[in-house]
Amino acid sequence: MRAVLETADIAIVALYFILVMCIGFFAMWKSNRSTVSGYFLAGRSMTWVAIGASLFVSNIGSEHFIGLAGSGAASGFAVGAWEFNALLLLQLLGWVFIPIYIRSGVYTMPEYLSKRFGGHRIQVYFAALSLILYIFTKLSVDLYSGALFIQESMGWNLYVSVILLIGMTALLTVTGGLVAVIYTDTLQALLMIVGALTLMVISMMEIGGFEEVKRRYMLASPNVTSILLTYNLSNTNSCNVHPKKDALKMLRNPTDEDVPWPGFILGQTPASVWYWCADQVIVQRVLAAKNIAHAKGSTLMAGFLKLLPMFIIVVPGMISRILFADDIACINPEHCMQVCGSRAGCSNIAYPRLVMKLVPVGLRGLMMAVMIAALMSDLDSIFNSASTIFTLDVYKLIRKSASSRELMIVGRIFVAFMVVISIAWVPIIVEMQGGQMYLYIQEVADYLTPPVAALFLLAIFWKRCNEQGAFYGGMAGFILVVVRLTLAFAYRAPECDQPDNRPVFIKDIHYMYVATALFWITGLITVIVSLLTPPPTKEQIRTTTFWSKKSLVVKESCSPKDEPYKMQEKSILRCSENSEVINHVIPNGKSEDSIKGLQPEDVNLLVTCREEGNPVASLGHSEAETPVDAYSNGQAALMGEKERKKEAEDGSRYWKFIDWFCGFKSKSLSKRSLRDLMEEEAVCLQMLEEPPQVKVILNIGLFGVCSLGIFMFVYFSL
């Protein structure tokens, strides 16, 4: 019987919605959303606490509450391996990848590939692949999981609830940008952890403790006789009714169908490297940090938080099987269809069933808010990151002279487009809902991502890797992926009570071993082709590899014919219409003579003037192709249209409100840009500086979190 929302539940859910929207509008009011950096990277102003919380909830979405708990109910501790693996890979992001991304001065991961290898074909390939993954895998999983929870626990109309959630999330993302996303993620992290911990404590008290969970889980089998009498089934066969013998182990033997340890280490880990170290959703948050110390602190915080899902999601899923074995462990497809509407199995209802049966009125509203928080967090992450990739890696290739205002508009329009796609996808999700969809999407992600992970690792750790090697290696991996996916969908797994007549190479080779082969084949082809073709230029590897030296100063030039001006960090250059310097500011009393001995290769920031007087800003010698006449802190301020301010001043109140609502601050931009840019954070390279004491503290934290992660792997695998 489905629960009915009580007044207290409705009040708590409504209060949550009000809080989220207030935070979003607060971000609109306080933050600078009128520039690419301000909207997409929160102006590089976020602290480690906010980013760490955002990293956690960006990953732990509604599909984790449904999927992790469901997998815990079906197969025990195994699924927790992904969480402990993420704990370690987050530190790889903070200590290895993020310093390189900051030094390169990039906003997006396709942009990094373009700077590292040159050209645009790898950039476009990776951008398209990322958008496909976001829209048709992450988005579909989130909507399926959220819809399943809403249907199971609250009985809301599916379409109305999903459309409402998508619409609110899109409004929050469009208006506030990454600042709003990170601020709301901080609230959602607190809400999710408190709610999930509450349910864990209640369920543990019901069972009698963690040791009792392990003992009773191994006995949690459905009563087949009672089920056959109760449901009047025509099919009396039963399958998969008993817990697996190694359910209490995490990493299992090489032939295990869930987590074979060689496949997990050699295949799943590279796939996870892509997600945690090269996925726009994750990396974009860390790039919003004030400096490298805050970036590392955020990955440490997120790493410690990743210890929680094993205990607040997976274990409650196991408890749900203990308490409701006749439903969660349905005995055959006919029984499963009657219980949860899916012939594939009913383990996905483990968490919603636990909420509705154990949680009292009032707290049930809190748990509903937790699930809404998880769903909205994932959706706003996808909306913001996908719009960033589309705007900066696809649209700017089509419209190279696009202004900053135009890029902001396009980013918001693309979010609206994704909302339409999301709503159109709902009927397909309804038709596909069941355990199989979630599992298939996880498998698809493991097929698509290992080749990309191989390219990123080689790009960062091997200077000799070039564009030809990366492109042909990536294409070879992609062709293999398409072949394997085609075979996987052509030969679908049979229902549990039917014989498996699929070919041996489909039936008996675990997808993690396929991911292993894809990763190493892509890497091998990339290495061979790179060695047979010319090496990359020094400019391509100057700031984009692990071995790059830290650039210390800024080079700025206002004429392609003259010698470049060499300037201090936080310097600002302004040009007249005839390409002459009219304002050359060097703070702290430094003179040009003090830096003239530096070589061009020591310089990272370049600003050059075109004949029409608009400089072209470049970081790491990669043209941004946006007309500017001031550049600082890795952020270009649009100044080319000097007469446009009259238009803004003369506009109606309606258009002024629209400009404020969407973050377009064209009015008085030319008057405020110099002062504001002088007051901003140091340029990207200055962000890499760490005080010695802070560095020691961070390294101690690194040792602690990595030790905990390894201990958890060992403890749950023995």
Swiss-Prot record:
One of its GO terms (cellular component) is apical plasma membrane. It is a multi-pass membrane protein. Its main location: membrane. It comes from Bos taurus. This is Sodium/myo-inositol cotransporter. Residues 1-9, 58-86, 145-157, 206-303, 377-406, 463-510, 717-718 are extracellular. CDD domains: SLC5sbd_SMIT. The gene is SLC5A3. Belongs to the sodium:solute symporter (SSF) (TC 2.A.21) family. The chain crosses the membrane at residues 10-29, 39-57, 87-110, 124-144, 158-183, 187-205, 304-324, 354-376, 407-430, 444-462, 511-532, 696-716. GO terms for molecular function: D-glucose:sodium symporter activity. GO terms for biological process: inositol metabolic process; myo-inositol transport. InterPro entries: Na/Glc_symporter_sf, Na/solute_symporter, Na/solute_symporter_CS, SMIT. Residues 30-38, 111-123, 184-186, 325-353, 431-443, 533-695 are cytoplasmic. The modification Phosphoserine is found at S594, S632. Interacts with KCNQ2 (via the pore module). Interacts with KCNQ1; this interaction is direct. Forms coregulatory complexes with ion channels KCNQ2-KCNQ3 and KCNQ1-KCNE2. Disulfide bonds: none annotated. Keywords: Cell membrane, Glycoprotein, Ion transport, Membrane, Phosphoprotein, Sodium, Sodium transport, Symport, Transmembrane, Transmembrane helix, Transport. The record marks G24, R285 as: Implicated in sodium coupling. It is found in: Apical cell membrane; Basolateral cell membrane. Electrogenic Na(+)-coupled sugar symporter that actively transports myo-inositol and its stereoisomer scyllo-inositol across the plasma membrane, with a Na(+) to sugar coupling ratio of 2:1. Maintains myo-inositol concentration gradient that defines cell volume and fluid balance during osmotic stress, in particular in the fetoplacental unit and central nervous system. Forms coregulatory complexes with voltage-gated K(+) ion channels, allosterically altering ion selectivity, voltage dependence and gating kinetics of the channel. Glycans are attached at N232.
